[in-house]
Design a protein with these regions (language model features):
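Residue-level detector of alpha-helix boundaries and kinks
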Residues: 30, 37, 68-69, 154, ...
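Exposed alpha-helical structural elements
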Residues: 8, 72, 82-83, 168, ...
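Non-catalytic regulatory/interaction regions at protein termini and inter-domain linkers
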Residues: 1-14, 290-304, 317
């Protein structure tokens, strides 16, 4: 009975034109709504795509501008590197003084805050290694000032004592950086530096250091002469530096360096290389020809870094004076 009733009601609905019309209107309205909704979604999608395309174009423009600026900056740094290289002693000049030497010189960026100096005057050899505060452009500018000053102090002012070289450089930098108008130094950066002055006749070496030491390898032993724990132009107060002496023999090796090699992070635990490892490797490789020593130092630090970024400029000088 209920099934027969339901069938009768269904037949009645199909035969009712009002209901059929209402259903048709509902279906048409639903289709129109869906069409409008789809059209609206399409417009929003097109607008979004247009905005994305505009943003992408803007990003491409900015990327092109950044690439151009980076190229300009890199070109400027490369040119600055050539200027810096022109100020550093040439290979021909150094080899004329010390036929047996190497220079491991590895800037963090294109230009370096480390610099070295070799000179010969009045039967004396002059060797210096310096590490200016910072690296990159600021360090390079400071190093260029330091190169000009050491040339002036040793060759023009003819300062012969190692401690006086550091003291004179301190005074020259003080004069350059101190401004009476404000009563304060405009630059507080300093220079870590080591300098050896060797008398060719007596073979007596004078050494003074501002933080940096000198290593001497003789008969499979490493001798360290430490520098003072103060920078050149660390402060503008009255300063002084100690002077040590050491008589060199045939076959002695001198190593001067900045702190970049020892401070480089790496290894299995991402720790600093440290000076004890540097002393060990220098003593180990001291029996090899100096060009081979330079290669081994480069390979060693590359292996130690294991993909880590270089954190500072690196410089190691190896010299056999006699």
């Amino acid at each position: 009975m209920p099934s027969a009733l339901a069938a009768a009601m269904a037949d009645g609905l199909r035969d009712n034109p009002v209901i059929n019309y209402a259903i048709a209107v509902f279906i048409v309205v639903a289709l129109i709504y869906l069409a409008v909704l789809q059209f609206w979604v399409l417009l929003r999608t097109r607008k979004h795509l247009s905005e994305m395309k505009s943003a992408y174009s803007e990003i491409e423009i900015q990327r092109s501008e950044l690439q151009l600026r980076n190229k300009d900056l890199t070109d400027s740094l490369n040119y600055a590197r050539r200027i810096q290289a022109a100020l550093l002693p040439s290979e021909h000049h150094i080899r004329r003084i010390f036929p047996d030497y190497f220079i491991y010189y590895r800037p963090k960026h294109i230009v370096s805050g480390d610099f070295y100096w070799f000179s010969e005057r009045d039967d004396k050899y002059f060797i210096a290694a310096a590490d200016c505060t910072g690296h990159g452009v600021p360090g390079a500018l400071m190093s260029m000032i330091g190169l000009e000053l050491i040339h002036k102090i040793i060759n023009d002012m003819k300062v012969d004592d190692s401690d006086q070289v550091l003291l004179t450089m301190n005074r020259e930098l003080e004069s350059a950086f101190y401004k009476e108008e404000s009563g304060k130094p405009i630059i507080k950066d300093g220079i870590e530096m080591s300098i050896c002055i060797i008398d060719k006749k007596t073979r007596l070496m004078e050494f003074s250091g501002a933080f940096l030491p000198v290593y001497i390898v003789r008969d499979d032993k490493l001798i360290e002469i430490k520098g003072d724990k103060k920078n050149v132009v660390q402060s503008f107060a009255m300063v002084s530096f100690n002077r040590s002496t050491f008589t060199l023999q045939d076959g002695d090796l001198l190593y001067l360096f900045s702190d970049g090699y020892a401070d480089q992070f790496g290894g299995p635990d991402n720790k600093k290389f440290m000076y004890r490892r540097l002393r060990h490797i220098l003593l180990t490789i001291s029996k090899y020809p100096l060009p081979d020593q330079q290669r081994i130092l480069d390979e060693t630090i590359d292996s130690w870094m294991e993909g880590h970024d270089q954190i500072d400029d690196m410089m190691i000088l190896g010299v056999k004076p006699f």
